[in-house]
Amino acid sequence: MAFELPNLPYDYDALAPYMSRETLEYHHDKHHLAYVTNGNKLAEEAGLSDLSLEDIVKKSYGTNQPLFNNAGQHYNHVHFWKWMKKGGGGTSLPGKLDAAIKSDLGGYDKFRADFSAAGAGQFGSGWAWLSVKNGKLEISKTPNGENPLVHGATPILGVDVWEHSYYIDYRNARPKYLEAFVDNLINWDYVLELYEAAAK
């Protein structure tokens, strides 16, 4: 299937002051658009255009790095925009998700610390993740455009730690960006939706 740039599910000003209009304009309108444009060209050249995005990501991993980079980043960003909302974050998680975080990760405070540490500790560009693997939640980090799909897990929350995600708003203070993301931006309803789908 052809890659398409999704519209943001909120206005460009909606996430301020935690993520500015300028960041969203550059990140969505330029960076994500480039992954879509390049990904479509590379998928067509590889004869994989008819596959789903998830299948293109899995098939290109380790076999077609240019395609994987763009397909992986497109997949990651399609979800990234939905993982945020105005007035998001905080400790009031949906019950089922709260229970899973308690049983699998040791509770919200430990999740917050470990998820933020994964993002802060990713050397260079990459992502931090909350995923479902073998029925349990796990936190991980990946370089560049890689994601948990290629490691047998289903991502239900991710945060982009490429510099273009935060440099306009936070300069080199990646931990402050991660703190703002967790405390003020996460769309826990969307995380729950993905968790329930992955747990089936």
Curated annotation (Swiss-Prot):
- Which InterPro entries would you find in this protein's record? Mn/Fe_SOD, Mn/Fe_SOD_BS, Mn/Fe_SOD_C, Mn/Fe_SOD_N, Mn/Fe_SOD_N_sf, SOD_C_sf
Cofactor(s) needed:
Mn(2+)
- The enzyme's E.C. designation: 1.15.1.1
Annotated residues for binding of Mn(2+): H27, H77, D160, H164
Give the reaction(s) catalysed.
Answer: 2 superoxide + 2 H(+) = H2O2 + O2
Q: Which EC class is this protein assigned?
A: oxidoreductase
Bound cofactor: record note: Binds 1 Mn(2+) ion per subunit.
One GO MF term attached to the UniProt entry: metal ion binding
Q: Which SUPFAM superfamilies match?
A: Fe,Mn superoxide dismutase (SOD), C-terminal domain, Fe,Mn superoxide dismutase (SOD), N-terminal domain
Keyword line: Manganese, Metal-binding, Oxidoreductase
Free-text function comment from the UniProt entry:
Destroys superoxide anion radicals which are normally produced within the cells and which are toxic to biological systems.
Q: Which family does it belong to?
A: Belongs to the iron/manganese superoxide dismutase family.
Q: How does the annotation summarize its subunit structure?
A: Homodimer.
Name of the protein this chain belongs to: Superoxide dismutase [Mn]
Native source species: Rhizobium meliloti (strain 1021)
Name the encoding gene, please: sodB
